[in-house]
């Protein structure tokens, strides 16, 4: 790996490590997303805590965290594998941020950015899948899980296995991070889109 590739990967991780949910909640003088609602510093929890405007800002920045480094990697290296690895590093930064004690979000919004940066078709597959599941079920977590699996595995049909591998790893990591959501979905205790935030409890 040359210096350029290494620098891009480090940049992707560091940019991913900037947790917009925590910063946005601080700026809007809202409770910390790590202490209320689901306890997850992500867009859905910010929506429950502060409403549409803070959530929209969080979503946009989280998407850009994935989009920007992937586009940079694509333009500067022209290497699909390095670009896919850049996507992985951006996700790792979001989920395990060095600036916030390695305790971050679940990576879904950042994944959207990486998918659009890698291939707009993959990004579109994710968004359409998410919207369809969300409209039918009103579960943000279920929508994210289904869209993540479908979009990530779709890479196999557009690239070789080596290039697809980083996205498959991303899918596995995001599924593991949603373990609690999966358990609550099974038990019927998962919050739906539009539910108000409550103080963090044992179920989160």
UniProtKB/Swiss-Prot annotation:
Subcellular compartments: Cell inner membrane
The keyword Nucleotidyltransferase is assigned to this record: no
GO cellular component, one term: plasma membrane
Enzyme Commission designation: 2.3.1.275
Membrane topology note: Multi-pass membrane protein
Function field: Catalyzes the transfer of an acyl group from acyl-phosphate (acyl-PO(4)) to glycerol-3-phosphate (G3P) to form lysophosphatidic acid (LPA). This enzyme utilizes acyl-phosphate as fatty acyl donor, but not acyl-CoA or acyl-ACP.
Protein name: Glycerol-3-phosphate acyltransferase
Native organism: Francisella tularensis subsp. holarctica (strain LVS)
Annotated gene: plsY
